[in-house]
């Protein structure tokens, strides 16, 4: 699938593209060999963008036995969709699948608090801003169906001739500075190498042991989530569901004491996510970190009294926090983490999928610029020499942004699950809306690398001053910990009131 030992036909295809497949055109080759571990959103987008930037994707390995279609709804914000101007087929598919329904916010007693509301990134001024850019993506759906979005990425990867090697588990990561390569040892004893290995394999990636010598400890957020998606006809078989939602296309949040629920119903799909505080759970129902749909509706009934869903279709996922580590790159710079392997997020951030795609775009672009001097002399001993610089630039550009985004998760969690002053909400219903800050959704990850690479290079090489501008304007970034945030919340403080700068 693009290695130098295979036939020349796929190599020619990778280098020139195929206009009949509506694929993007690849840039001049950098001769950087890229091995990707993990075929989720981050890994697949990394494969696509690395190909487009001229890198040689020599492998995509995935531990699951096949594509993992678990999940329900995702939110991909405009900052990650800007890149679709380079991928016309995916852009068309997104346009066909977009969800335009408004969002409704209810109290647990049925009182409509707000709605139909739309994400502020679809406010007229921001839609016009994106529409004015060549190939811009004007209207962005409030949600995407995860299965459809994931299949779209898989189809585009297949169009480029790539194959995902499923059922491949990584035993360990390694790098060899003298040889200028990194690699993975698989559980079957085989070894795979490349100039750079992209760890896109999620929580507890084995890459952590190379980068930090240990796994990051986790802490309970005091919440977990029951989530599922299934054909709408199964839900509509229930009389109460038909009376309340029959024939509607709706996206709703229901807010109660110690719990909030997100609900989506369309003619084809029903989905919900129930996020209770841990004190509402039975003692023997502590969630484990697994995307296996192994929860029965009876368990959900214990929390919510009733759920009309098919058996063994629900995932119970603990919302566990991890302090964000500054380093996402191995000591030699040839193993690099993206997506959840680098920074865990929770649903209330409304940004996990967006960050994963932004990471992939940023990394591919950073490697392109870092490798351009070696690429000018063609393949050979110098190929891949710029990789360590490229991965470190990527890390520098992404860490603070990911940290600020994680903090927004606390804001949204408090808004949806801890609101008590309903008179204030009635006076200003926007107080309960999920926050989509403009500093986040107006970002252009590809353009940002081109803008900041020189400054980042000077900072890494000579210690020159460097400031990221992909975080809230006016914010003075400082490293923070989950323990500190928990103390503030336990004292009754709102995280939103503790933020400096413009987080709107």
From Swiss-Prot:
Q: What is the similarity comment for this entry?
A: Belongs to the paxM FAD-dependent monooxygenase family.
> What is the documented function of this protein?
FAD-dependent monooxygenase; part of the gene cluster that mediates the biosynthesis of the tetrahydroxanthone dimer neosartorin, which exhibits antibacterial activity. The two different monomeric units appear to be synthesized by the same set of enzymes, among which the Baeyer-Villiger monooxygenase nsrF is the key enzyme for the divergence of the biosynthetic routes. The pathway begins with the synthesis of atrochrysone thioester by the polyketide synthase nsrB.
Signal peptide, first to last residue: none
Which keywords does the record carry? FAD, Flavoprotein, Monooxygenase, Oxidoreductase
List the Pfam families hit by this protein, alphabetically.
FAD_binding_3
Q: Which InterPro entries match?
A: FAD-bd, FAD-dep_Monooxygenase_BioMet, FAD/NAD-bd_sf
Phenotypic effect of disruption: Impairs the production of neosartorin and accumulates two isomeric metabolites, moniliphenone and 2,2',6'-trihydroxy-4-methyl-6-methoxya-cyldiphenylmethanone.
Question: Which residues catalyse the reaction?
Answer: 227
Q: What class of enzyme is it?
A: oxidoreductase
Residues binding FAD, per UniProt? 146, 340, 353
> Would the keyword Ribonucleoprotein turn up in this protein's UniProt record?
no
Its UniProt pathway annotation is: Secondary metabolite biosynthesis
Q: What is this protein called?
A: FAD-dependent monooxygenase nsrK
Q: Tell me the domain of life.
A: Eukaryota
Is Flavoprotein included in the keywords of this UniProt record? Answer: yes
Assigned EC number = 1.-.-.-
Residues that span the membrane, as ranges: none
Parts forming coiled coils? none
Q: What is the lineage of its organism?
A: Eukaryota, Fungi, Dikarya, Ascomycota, Pezizomycotina
Q: Which Gene3D superfamilies match?
A: FAD/NAD(P)-binding domain
Molecular function, one GO term: FAD binding
Q: Name what cofactor the protein needs.
A: FAD
């Amino acid at each position: 699938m693009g290695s130098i030992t295979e036939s020349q036909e796929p190599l020619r295809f990778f280098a020139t593209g195929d206009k009949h497949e509506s694929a993007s055109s690849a840039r001049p080759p950098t001769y950087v060999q890229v091995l990707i571990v993990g075929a989720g959103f981050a890994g697949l987008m990394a494969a696509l963008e690395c190909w487009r930037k001229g890198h040689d994707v020599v492998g995509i390995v995935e531990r699951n036995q096949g594509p993992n279609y678990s999940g329900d709804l995702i939110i991909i914000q405009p900052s990650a969709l800007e890149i679709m101007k380079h991928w016309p087929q995916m852009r068309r598919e997104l346009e066909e699948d977009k969800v335009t329904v408004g969002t409704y916010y209810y109290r647990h007693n049925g009182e409509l608090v707000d709605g139909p509301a739309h994400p502020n990134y679809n406010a007229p001024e921001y839609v016009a801003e994106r529409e004015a850019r060549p190939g811009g993506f004007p209207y962005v759906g409030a949600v995407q169906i995860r299965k459809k979005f994931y299949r779209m990425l898989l189809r585009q990867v297949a169009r480029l001739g790539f194959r995902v090697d499923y059922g491949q588990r990584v035993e360990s990561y390694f790098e060899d500075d003298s040889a200028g390569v990194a690699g993975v040892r698989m559980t079957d004893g085989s070894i795979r190498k490349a100039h750079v290995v992209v760890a896109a394999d999620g929580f507890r990636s084995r890459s952590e042991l190379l980068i930090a010598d240990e796994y990051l400890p986790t802490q309970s957020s005091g919440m977990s989530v029951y989530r599922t998606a299934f054909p709408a006809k199964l839900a509509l078989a229930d009389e109460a569901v038909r009376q309340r939602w029959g024939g509607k296309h709706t996206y709703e949040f229901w807010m109660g004491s110690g719990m909030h629920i997100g609900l989506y119903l369309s003619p084809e799909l029903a989905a919900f996510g129930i996020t209770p505080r841990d004190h509402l759970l039975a003692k023997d129902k502590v969630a484990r970190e697994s995307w296996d749909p192994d929860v029965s509706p009876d368990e959900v009934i214990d929390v919510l009294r009733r759920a009309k869903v098919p058996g063994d279709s629900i995932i119970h996922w603990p919302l566990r926090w991890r302090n964000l580590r500054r380093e996402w790159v191995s000591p030699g710079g040839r193993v690099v983490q993206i997506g959840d392997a680098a920074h865990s997020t929770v649903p209330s951030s409304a940004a996990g999928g967006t960050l994963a795609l932004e990471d992939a775009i940023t990394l591919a672009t950073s490697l392109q610029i870092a490798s351009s001097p070696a690429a000018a002399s063609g393949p050979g001993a110098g190929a891949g020499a710029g990789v360590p610089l490229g991965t470190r630039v990527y890390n520098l550009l992404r860490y603070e942004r990911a940290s600020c985004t994680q903090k927004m998760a606390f804001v949204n969690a408090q808004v949806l699950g801890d609101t008590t002053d309903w008179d204030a909400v009635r006076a200003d219903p926007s107080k309960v809306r999920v926050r989509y800050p403009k500093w986040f959704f107006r970002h252009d990850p590809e353009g940002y690398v081109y803008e900041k690479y020189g400054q980042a290079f000077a900072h890494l090489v000579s210690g020159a001053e460097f400031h990221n501008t992909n975080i809230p304007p006016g914010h003075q970034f400082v490293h923070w910990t989950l323990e500190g945030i928990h103390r503030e919340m336990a004292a009754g403080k709102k995280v939103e009131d503790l933020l400096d700068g413009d987080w709107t």
